[in-house]
Amino acid sequence: MSCILGCNSNTKNTYLLNDILHDSKEPIIKKVLSDLNSHEVQILLTRINRDSLGVPKFERHTFQVNSEHYFYPASTVKFPVAILALQKIRKLQSQGIPIKADTPFKILYSENVIKRTDSTHPKNNLTIAHLIKKIFLVSDNMAYNYLFDFIGRDDANKAIHNIGITNFNLSHKFSDSDSDLENKNRTPRFIFFNQKGDTIYNQAPITSNQKIKNTHLDGVLKGKGYVKDGTTIDESMDFSEKNYASIAALNQILERIIFPKVFSRNEQFNIEPEDYFFLRYWMSRTPNEVTIPFYDRETFFDSYCKFFIYGDKKGEMTNNTRIYNKVGLAYGTTTDLAYVKDRNGIEFFLTATILTNKNEIFNDNKYEYEQLGIPFLAALGREIYQFEKNKN
């Protein structure tokens, strides 16, 4: 058991998380603890202690956290991509380009327009700001794909590494209907235009030259088989060319958005105060609280993208507790990274992942998300919240 060093942190080598887990009366936690090896659980808790001036100091505690052991981050990587899209907008503004996050744009492959409108936008516009909202509300894959291309893969990785975050590499987009038009190492063209329809920024296709391979990590070969084109292949699935984001890296990104001033200037994202407010607002909303964009309340319930505390419940979230987070769910891996804060001053960061793939076959869509993955993270969130509440 170890604590991860970080900026303005008070590190303690304790068994806090181990004790919380083993003292838990939650059946789902006991079940996972009985088979830790197959579930590849990693948990990072950051307790927040404020001084007399209200300045936060971080006290980190870990359970099985290992940045050298690979887990598939799934949609959690949409969070840094949302941040970097806003950062790129600010960079373009600094170059004199009259562009904003709500400037409409269109996307072209080989000069053919493949995307220009968004039916969930009140004006039917495709904008960076609206795509970010969709990422946090319902984890929209296409929204991530468009932002990924807008930034460029190599530039995205460089931007994260430049602020001191390691053990992080983006390599791919998610499944989308434009895949037949896509060159994986070359983005489409982006054209931003004003209300008159005049072009204000024309971004040529970006070519990515980095070769992403996670072969140095443990656990990149997973399971005993995987499904490809409807056929089961009897060998481990290779994740070495998939996206990679360690528990520590995800947590560090979130800390920089919630408490940017805790970090030195060269460790912060290069965005403006209103960008921080925008990100915090939308990452803490639920589909039920929002009318634009509107999502069906039955399909996209309040805890649809909130796994900690409420993931195994529907219709029970209240304004008393805000969860600023991004979840990931794919290849049997369930992950959440969150800053939790309630009206009584209880606050903490919690990042955790669990693998639930009983048959050890990947890509067969037979995973225990609802039975085990999400309920475990929900129970874990409740245990940590209750622990912090008792301490207060």
Q: Which residues make up each language-model segment?
A:
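C-terminal motif of bacterial Sec signal peptides marking the signal peptidase cleavage site
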Residues: 3-6
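Structured C-terminal helix/loop/strand segments within mature extracytoplasmic catalytic/sensor domains
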Residues: 12-28, 35, 229-392
